[in-house]
A protein has these predicted regions:
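Structured surface patches comprising rigid loops and adjacent beta-strands/short helices at the edges
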Residues: 54-62
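Basic/aromatic-rich interaction segments and small domains that mediate binding to polyanionic partners
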Residues: 2, 6-55
């Protein structure tokens, strides 16, 4: 399984969360607090770093 983040909140060093509309993909193994719940740690090409994504801003894709 993988997760497709369509609109996600990138929690970084900035005080205000950034809303990103580009698609970022992550594996289900990136889940930290249960599948489809909590936050995902995903690599972002745009940020060129690992970032936290909230699960309620994504949908799960069956592989």
């Amino acid at each position: 399984m993988r997760v497709e983040f369509i609109e996600m909140i990138v929690v970084g060093e900035s005080i205000k969360p950034i809303l990103v509309k580009s698609k970022v993909y992550g594996k289900s193994s990136d889940v930290k607090h249960g599948f489809r719940v909590g936050r995902y740690r995903v690599w972002s090409k745009r940020a060129n770093a690992l970032v936290w994504m909230w699960a309620d801003h994504c949908r799960v894709i069956e592989e």
